[in-house]
């Protein structure tokens, strides 16, 4: 039986513990209520590794673009009086989900995981604990071809990066597809680039408010992947964006890529085509806009897919345009003139950038087999991916990427089409962007990511795919419940450190002397660092010959064959057919010779 003294001691201990819990609870709640320029927001503490991170999810940064605000630039937010509960992700912006492979995690992981709504202009903040003072800020911009994407995806969770590197991570939703990029250039009611103006307003929000979260508005680095990287590089070119950030990281995308910016005429034609499809063909722009604003967003989504021919792949239906406001000229021109923010950039690409696009309609390709394609299927693939290119242009690609190599392996056409798409759309534009940037004396760093994740659900032949460095940038391999390897955790920690060092100091090496120094990229030697699970190495002039083909030779071929008459066209077509016959004969003869030699040895 317990003594009276023991009971009193236990009661005292319980009261003390209860008091400690209450004090701790109130202290924690007080810590996670932040006062912004628009009002107070409540966040939450998340356990991360051996500590915590404070997360604020779903903070509004603009008025909902509803009704008369549809298709317009985002409007500044008014103040609220209550405490905004920022403890769960907000709506995703309206978009078409990828339904090509239902239930397959490789494609489903990129689909929106919150409700779709036009009321979607919200951002997220992850801050290390205890609350920092003047911490570097890293703002993530998601990709998705300007057609899809949301900041709430698990692969974009900022908690590990905030915890390990003690930076503040911010991400925002922005409008995509027709609702974000429909354009009647020159008309303020539907100016185009609304999604980019959304991003820009989020950057302004960070400048005004991030100090309240412990961040330094004078140390802000933008980073993004694919169309997100294209967006980041457009902010480098946009005079109104340039004062709103410090540095930039571009992962597998740049604004000078062929898909990143469309002409004014093309943008207007697509807007009028969409209007026609949904019954909004009117006599003037005012009536068209009024009609489009009254349409259900789901109807707009369904019809925006029809604007580009179905046999065209890798097409951005609605994307950035030269509006004279956000973007004053084509990116190539601005780069040539040196009209971009003078700062430091970190740029890079993945080893197999093209494969992710091949399983979405290229002849002979499938995620369920090895996709060993024929010469004819390769040629059909070129027609789909280069719809406006002449036969002679496509034959030049075939000759350079296949015939010139005299490769006898069965995989040669599959690998060649991967290289063609990756070089043309991602790798060579990124290298060209970095080269132009560095020529004016700006510090640039370039990486080549070559590790295939052990958790990748796509088939082995697809290699180190477009988009699959992101999980390492955000530290997902540090999550013990997911079965990444120890080497992958080390790689992820290394990449997070490189990215954070660059954000803090403008140099991925930081202030420490590591075993392998990441050298600056100069236009003369073009040094770059490989990122893998073994050991990083420094090389020079990545894909230099292939990029010369796209920047120098290929445009000349198109120029020289653009105006040939029909007789010469027929003669050349006949010559190429003869050349194909000769290639087949050569292959059969080599096969015959090989068999003859093997028989002679019997």
Curated annotation (Swiss-Prot):
<comment type="function">
    <text>Esterase with broad substrate specificity. Contributes to the inactivation of the neurotransmitter acetylcholine. Can degrade neurotoxic organophosphate esters.</text>
</comment>
<feature type="signal peptide">
    <location>
        <begin position="1"/>
        <end position="28"/>
    </location>
</feature>
<feature type="binding site">
    <location>
        <begin position="144"/>
        <end position="145"/>
    </location>
    <ligand>
        <name>substrate</name>
    </ligand>
</feature>
<feature type="glycosylation site" description="N-linked (GlcNAc...) asparagine">
    <location>
        <position position="85"/>
    </location>
</feature>
<dbReference type="GO" id="GO:0004104">
    <property type="term" value="F:cholinesterase activity"/>
</dbReference>
<dbReference type="InterPro" id="IPR029058">
    <property type="entry name" value="AB_hydrolase_fold"/>
</dbReference>
<dbReference type="GO" id="GO:0005615">
    <property type="term" value="C:extracellular space"/>
</dbReference>
<feature type="active site" description="Acyl-ester intermediate">
    <location>
        <position position="226"/>
    </location>
</feature>
<dbReference type="GO" id="GO:0005886">
    <property type="term" value="C:plasma membrane"/>
</dbReference>
<feature type="glycosylation site" description="N-linked (GlcNAc...) asparagine">
    <location>
        <position position="513"/>
    </location>
</feature>
<feature type="glycosylation site" description="N-linked (GlcNAc...) asparagine">
    <location>
        <position position="514"/>
    </location>
</feature>
<feature type="disulfide bond">
    <location>
        <begin position="93"/>
        <end position="120"/>
    </location>
</feature>
<keyword id="KW-0732">Signal</keyword>
<dbReference type="InterPro" id="IPR014788">
    <property type="entry name" value="AChE_tetra"/>
</dbReference>
<feature type="glycosylation site" description="N-linked (GlcNAc...) asparagine">
    <location>
        <position position="483"/>
    </location>
</feature>
<feature type="glycosylation site" description="N-linked (GlcNAc...) asparagine">
    <location>
        <position position="284"/>
    </location>
</feature>
<dbReference type="GO" id="GO:0006581">
    <property type="term" value="P:acetylcholine catabolic process"/>
</dbReference>
<protein>
    <recommendedName>
        <fullName>Cholinesterase</fullName>
        <ecNumber>3.1.1.8</ecNumber>
    </recommendedName>
</protein>
<dbReference type="GO" id="GO:0019695">
    <property type="term" value="P:choline metabolic process"/>
</dbReference>
<feature type="glycosylation site" description="N-linked (GlcNAc...) asparagine">
    <location>
        <position position="269"/>
    </location>
</feature>
<dbReference type="InterPro" id="IPR019826">
    <property type="entry name" value="Carboxylesterase_B_AS"/>
</dbReference>
<keyword id="KW-0719">Serine esterase</keyword>
<keyword id="KW-0325">Glycoprotein</keyword>
<dbReference type="Pfam" id="PF00135">
    <property type="entry name" value="COesterase"/>
</dbReference>
<feature type="modified residue" description="Phosphoserine">
    <location>
        <position position="226"/>
    </location>
</feature>
<dbReference type="InterPro" id="IPR050654">
    <property type="entry name" value="AChE-related_enzymes"/>
</dbReference>
<dbReference type="Pfam" id="PF08674">
    <property type="entry name" value="AChE_tetra"/>
</dbReference>
<dbReference type="InterPro" id="IPR002018">
    <property type="entry name" value="CarbesteraseB"/>
</dbReference>
<dbReference type="InterPro" id="IPR000997">
    <property type="entry name" value="Cholinesterase"/>
</dbReference>
<feature type="glycosylation site" description="N-linked (GlcNAc...) asparagine">
    <location>
        <position position="134"/>
    </location>
</feature>
<feature type="glycosylation site" description="N-linked (GlcNAc...) asparagine">
    <location>
        <position position="369"/>
    </location>
</feature>
<comment type="similarity">
    <text>Belongs to the type-B carboxylesterase/lipase family.</text>
</comment>
<comment type="subunit">
    <text>Homotetramer; disulfide-linked. Dimer of dimers.</text>
</comment>
<feature type="active site" description="Charge relay system">
    <location>
        <position position="353"/>
    </location>
</feature>
<keyword id="KW-1015">Disulfide bond</keyword>
<dbReference type="GO" id="GO:0003990">
    <property type="term" value="F:acetylcholinesterase activity"/>
</dbReference>
<feature type="glycosylation site" description="N-linked (GlcNAc...) asparagine">
    <location>
        <position position="509"/>
    </location>
</feature>
<keyword id="KW-0964">Secreted</keyword>
<keyword id="KW-0378">Hydrolase</keyword>
<dbReference type="InterPro" id="IPR019819">
    <property type="entry name" value="Carboxylesterase_B_CS"/>
</dbReference>
<keyword id="KW-0597">Phosphoprotein</keyword>
<feature type="disulfide bond">
    <location>
        <begin position="280"/>
        <end position="291"/>
    </location>
</feature>
């Amino acid at each position: 039986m317990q003594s009276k003294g023991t009971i009193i001691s236990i009661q005292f201990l319980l009261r003390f513990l209860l008091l400690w819990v209450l004090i701790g609870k109130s202290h924690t709640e007080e810590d996670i209520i932040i006062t912004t320029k628009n009002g107070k927001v409540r966040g939450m503490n998340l356990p991360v590794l051996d500590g915590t991170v404070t997360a604020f999810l779903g903070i509004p940064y603009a008025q909902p673009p509803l009704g008369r605000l549809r298709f317009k630039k985002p409007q500044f937010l008014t103040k609220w009086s209550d405490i905004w509960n920022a403890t769960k992700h907000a709506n995703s912006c309206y978009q078409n989900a990828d339904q090509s492979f239902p239930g397959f995690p490789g494609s489903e992981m990129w689909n929106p995981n919150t409700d779709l709504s036009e009321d979607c202009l919200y951002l997220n903040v992850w801050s290390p604990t205890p609350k920092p003072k003047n911490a570097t800020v890293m703002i993530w911009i998601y990709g998705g071809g300007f057609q899809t994407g949301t900041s709430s995806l698990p692969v974009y969770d900022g908690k590990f990066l905030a915890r390990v590197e003690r930076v503040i991570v911010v991400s925002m939703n922005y409008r995509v597809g027709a609702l974000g990029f429909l354009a009647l250039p020159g008309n303020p009611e539907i100016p185009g680039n609304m999604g980019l103006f959304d991003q820009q307003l989020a950057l302004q929000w960070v400048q005004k408010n991030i100090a309240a979260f412990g961040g330094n508005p004078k140390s802000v680095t933008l980073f993004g992947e694919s169309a997100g990287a294209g967006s980041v590089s457009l902010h480098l070119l946009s005079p109104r964006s340039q004062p709103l950030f410090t540095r930039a990281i571009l992962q597998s995308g740049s604004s000078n890529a062929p898909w990143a910016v469309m002409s004014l005429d093309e943008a207007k034609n697509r807007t009028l085509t969409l209007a026609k499809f949904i019954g909004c063909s009117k006599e003037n722009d005012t009536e068209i806009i009024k009609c489009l604003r009254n349409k259900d967003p789901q109807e707009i989504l369904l019809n925006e897919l029809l604007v580009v021919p179905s046999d065209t792949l890798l097409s951005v239906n609605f994307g950035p345009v030269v509006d004279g406001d956000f973007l004053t000229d084509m990116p190539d021109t601005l780069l040539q003139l040196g009209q971009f923010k003078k700062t430091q950039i970190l740029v890079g690409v993945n080893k197999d950038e093209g494969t992710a696009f091949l399983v979405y309609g290229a002849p002979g390709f499938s995620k369920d087999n090895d996709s060993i394609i024929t010469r004819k299927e390769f040629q059909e693939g070129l027609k789909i991916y280069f719809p406006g290119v002449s036969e002679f242009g496509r034959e030049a690609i075939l000759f350079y990427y296949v015939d010139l190599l005299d490769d006898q392996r069965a995989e040669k056409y599959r690998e060649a089409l991967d290289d063609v798409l990756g070089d043309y759309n991602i790798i060579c534009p990124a290298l060209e962007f970095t080269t132009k940037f560095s020529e004016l004396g700006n510090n640039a760093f370039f990486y080549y990511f070559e590790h295939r994740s052990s958790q990748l659900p796509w088939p082995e032949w697809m290699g180190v795919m477009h988009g699959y460095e992101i999980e390492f940038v955000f530290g997902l391999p540090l999550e013990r419940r997911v079965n990444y390897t120890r080497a992958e955790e080390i790689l992820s920690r290394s990449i997070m450190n490189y990215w954070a060092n660059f954000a803090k100091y403008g140099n991925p090496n930081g202030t420490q002397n590591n075993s392998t120094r990441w050298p600056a990229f100069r236009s003369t030697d073009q040094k770059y660092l490989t990122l893998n699970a073994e050991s990083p190495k420094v090389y020079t002039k990545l894909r230099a010959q292939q990029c010369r083909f796209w920047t120098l030779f290929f445009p000349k071929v198109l120029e020289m064959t653009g105006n040939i008459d029909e007789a010469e066209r027929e003669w050349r077509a006949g010559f190429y057919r003869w050349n194909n016959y000769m290639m087949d004969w050569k292959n059969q003869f080599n096969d015959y010779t090989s068999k003859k030699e093997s028989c002679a040895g019997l």
